[in-house]
């Protein structure tokens, strides 16, 4: 809406970035999750969602806005950092971006489907693998059975 007039309805489409930001405001409100997703914020170490997600049963972590599976519990490990850590994402579901904020050079990870900020990837994972350090507030969890059932519909 622009001054009470529906703009996008007249155009007939909306850019994906705009759609997910509006959906984010609707689903996340003005929360830490919104700050993480759209302002490249970071969860507090050992946040409530991390405490819930660190010991989930077999399943997948999905993008809180698009529902796309991003990370698998089979690739999760305890890095001791206070953030969810994985050795890899689900194939083709994330994008990497150079991040030079705060005087550091890092690789930012975003959801390919919604574009939201997920976290960063570092080269210090187990057995020479990467460590995907992911903010829990922007994820949902589904058991493998529930995810496979829903995705087969």
Description of each model-found segment:
Residues 1-2, 112:
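Short, acidic, Ser/Thr-enriched surface-loop or helix-capping motifs
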Residues 28-153:
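A short Gly-Trp-Pro
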């Amino acid at each position: 809406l622009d001054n009470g007039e529906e703009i996008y309805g007249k155009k007939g489409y909306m850019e994906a970035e705009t759609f997910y930001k509006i959906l984010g405001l609707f689903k996340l409100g003005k929360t830490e999750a919104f700050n993480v997703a759209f302002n490249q914020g970071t969860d507090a170490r050992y946040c409530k969602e991390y405490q819930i997600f660190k010991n989930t049963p077999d399943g997948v972590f999905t993008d809180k806005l698009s529902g796309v599976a991003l990370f698998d519990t089979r690739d999760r490990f305890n890095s001791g950092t206070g953030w969810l850590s994985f050795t890899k994402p689900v194939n083709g579901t994330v994008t990497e971006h150079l991040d030079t904020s705060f005087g550091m050079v890092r690789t930012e990870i975003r959801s390919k489907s919604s574009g939201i900020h997920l976290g960063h990837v570092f080269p210090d994972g187990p057995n020479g693998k990467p460590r995907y350090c992911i903010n829990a507030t922007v994820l949902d969890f589904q058991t493998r059975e529930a995810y496979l059932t829903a995705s087969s519909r």
